[in-house]
Amino acid sequence: MKNWKKDSWKDCTIKHVPLYKDQEKLDKILARLNTFPPLVFAGECNNLKIQLAKATERKAFLVQGGDCAESFKEFSANNIRDTFRVLLQISAVITSEMKVPVIKLGRIAGQFTKPRSLDTETVNGTTLNSYYGDSVNGIEFTKEAREPDPERLLRTYSQSASTLNLLRSFAQGGFANLRKVNSWNMGFVRSSKEGKKYEKIAHQITEYLDFMDAVGINTEQIIDLNTVDFYTSHEGLHLPYEEALTRVDSLSNKIYCTSAHFIWIGDRTRFIDSAHVEFCRGISNPIGIKCGPSLDPDELVKIIDVLNPDNEAGRISLIFRYGEKNINQHLPVLVDTINKHNKTVLWISDPMHGNTVKSSKGLKTRDFSALLNETTKAIHILKSKGSHLGGIHLEMTGQNVTECTGGLYKLSDKDLHSRYHTHCDPRLNANQALELSFNIAAEIEKNGH
């Protein structure tokens, strides 16, 4: 295999990377980014890989969640806090039910670029560049806004750095106190008659903490009950940006992409001779691979061989996204193929992307029951094959949006217009994400995690 370099991806087939008119300006911006400090550190990436390896052995569980696409406009401390809070709540529920640590991985601090099937979009006879995410161009349908602008990469870095700084403060500064997190969950349980069915799980945590206090253990002084490890992830789509933030670790001489702890390869960029696969081949971060209906399992095995020739546990996570109606057809074949070749992978359910539909009013949405049904089917399929579900991948927000139908509050098509704010795909709101986690945790526990 040819030697890897930071820019060897340029010799491969590249898809879904925008074209810039001013290449000289782009090169200058990338040169500046190349001198900026790393956003994450090698030791953090290694710690995450160790935790993911434990998840492959049923000794941990991954919760990966956040916005479909971050935006410059909605950037605020409150939005970051609310997303972080929901991820903490989900983690507490799953830990209580499954009795294993939860790895907290945000789709945050870098998820600014989106793949597009077409380079252009036509509205009322006017054709402009597609919206590739705020790191590339603006969502407004004007010629000026839709022109890819390299300056946006500087703002992407700046906002990612600010977000990471706040997340680290939340994670280590007392906001993650377990008793506080559980009080939020109790608030959810008591907020509606339907929520009462989850009360037992929420009460378990209270009982554990009360017992520790009763025997003289000061829970306020136990670091693990008041702080958490929190990691970041995004699709490594914008390769010029990712290359500019790739660094050599001074301690190990290994190479890391320092824009996030965890990088994933999307369903549309996952193929042999892919520039994105080539880039990820050389970095030491843990890598996710999205797996949809178009996947050829035998080709995936070849890609895994490229990315993880030593079959290192924790290096590869397979994030499958088939949809409720297709998972029974595709997932068993994939699991059989991976098991046949003895590949060590973490199985993560992404019930979001395969269940996107159009509402009666033409809005993209997802139904809560479809998300739960797909994940439930995944749990049973993996168990029948001698494997296990090791994580969930959710597009969600801490805001009270109305973008997905169903759930405790029985949101319907007619409710979607109320608070439909997404820049890309529909997200679960805080209550829906938490309700889904209650159900998934119970199902996994019932099936013997």
Predicted segments — roles?
Residues 300-303, 309, 315-347, 353-402, ...:
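Non-transmembrane, aqueous-exposed alpha-helical and coiled segments at domain scale
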Residues 52-55, 93-95, 279-280, 381-384:
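A general structural signal for short secondary-structure junctions and capping/turn motifs
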Residues 109, 352-353:
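Short glycine-enriched loops at secondary-structure junctions
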Residues 1-61:
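N-terminal basic/disordered segments at the start of proteins
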Residues 61-66, 103:
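Short, hydrophobic/glycine-enriched beta-strand segments
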Residues 69-70, 74-323, 366, 374, ...:
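Active-site-facing alpha/beta catalytic cores
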Residues 47-49, 273-276, 303, 332-334:
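Glycine-rich, charged/polar anion/phosphate-binding loops
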